[in-house]
Amino acid sequence: MVQVLAENKRVRANYHLLERYEAGLALTGEEVRAVRQKKVNLKGGFAKILGRELWLLNVHISTKDPSRSRKLLLHKQEIDRLAGKLQEKGTTLLPLRLYVKNNVIKVELGLCRGLKIYDKRELVKKRETEKKIQRAKMGLY
């Protein structure tokens, strides 16, 4: 059973999601308690590879040191694969959601590429036309 504790909804609006990864999170006891109480903010957070380790930066967890860097737990092969993909221009690794799975706190990371303003406008136009089509279908039936 998965219990979602925090979600970063702005990622889907501002970025094109290429891949998803599930990683464990190294937390202190105080941070675990704060996360379970949903005192977490993922906005502005990102993951970065330093050395051969993956770190979560700029994620606010309400404790004594709210924005400290937290180590992410992934296999070395996955980190190496991610390092190669992050070398491409315009790609970043962002936290999508924080959840509990089998009594362990996990973070879902997304390999993302930023959207341009005209891409966002296209998406809005596409959604509007789909809504109009749905309304027309509902009116016919």
Segments predicted by a language model, with ranges:
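Arg/Lys-rich, often Gly-containing low-complexity segments of ribosomal proteins
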Residues: 6-11, 39-40, 64-66, 70, ...
